[in-house]
């Protein structure tokens, strides 16, 4: 980060249930200080199978939980004293981390209530397994309408869309790889809902797979669906697949 001035770094999506807003803010501010103000924090409520099955923490009322989490997190990131007492979460105090910018916060919002909360209060949403039709007709409009109704200016919120990408001539084999590698997402309710909205049978349909021309065409569909930032997840483990995919993505990024 110190050697390259134009690269940003983001956390991906960090679950909120297993760390308090004070700890999350402390980590985010420290990272942003190290990154020279180029760090973006992503948060989300993860899935019932994770919170209840792995951690023994209730997943119920997840929208309320996230709202109260932001009540504590956002002021702390801005260097402010916070005194937020909610039904599910309490955050009181302040952090003493001088000379650090407030990092942007993105939320992994897919459903309408989460998107509206995101539009009102944060920098945007990070999507996964969400195709261009759903991005254009559901994700962007729901979030941006909520932002406008909250009095926020145009461009206040952004859509960052993440999808698997593989440039290959062996489409059948790589689709099978995608179906196997990303199978779990077809069974998690939030992602399953996005796949169903798009008319996709499974995660392999959401993945951008094909030769350079095909991948460029599908990426253009995503770009014109109101996406501000695209997060490519190369997944073909072969050396040729990795090289072709990264070369294609670099050429598109430079345009």
How would you label these PLM feature ranges?
Residues 1-255:
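Active-site-adjacent structural elements that line small-molecule/cofactor binding pockets in enzymes
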């Amino acid at each position: 980060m110190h050697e390259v001035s134009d690269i940003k770094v983001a956390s991906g999506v960090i679950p909120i249930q297993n760390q308090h807003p004070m700890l999350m803010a402390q980590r985010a501010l420290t990272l942003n200080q190290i990154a020279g103000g180029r760090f973006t924090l992503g948060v989300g409520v993860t899935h019932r199978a994770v919170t209840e099955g792995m951690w023994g923490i209730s997943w119920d009322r997840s929208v309320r939980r996230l709202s109260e989490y932001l009540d504590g997190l956002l002021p702390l990131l801005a260097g402010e004293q916070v005194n937020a007492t909610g039904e599910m979460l309490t955050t009181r105090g302040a952090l003493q981390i001088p000379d650090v910018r407030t990092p942007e916060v993105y939320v992994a919002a897919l459903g309408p209530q989460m998107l509206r909360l995101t539009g009102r209060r944060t920098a945007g949403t990070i999507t996964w397994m969400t195709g261009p039709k759903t991005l254009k007709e559901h994700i962007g409009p729901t979030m941006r309408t909520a932002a406008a109704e909250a009095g926020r200016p145009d461009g206040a919120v952004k859509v960052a869309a993440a999808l698997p990408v593989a440039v290959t001539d062996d489409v059948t084999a790589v689709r099978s790889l995608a179906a196997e590698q990303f199978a779990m997402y077809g069974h998690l309710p939030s992602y399953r809902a996005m796949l169903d909205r798009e008319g996709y049978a499974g995660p392999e349909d959401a993945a951008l797979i094909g030769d350079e021309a095909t991948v460029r065409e599908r990426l253009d569909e995503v770009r014109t669906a109101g996406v501000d930032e695209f997060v490519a997840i190369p997944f073909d483990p072969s050396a040729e697949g990795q090289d072709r995919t990264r070369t294609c993505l670099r050429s598109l990024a430079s345009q």
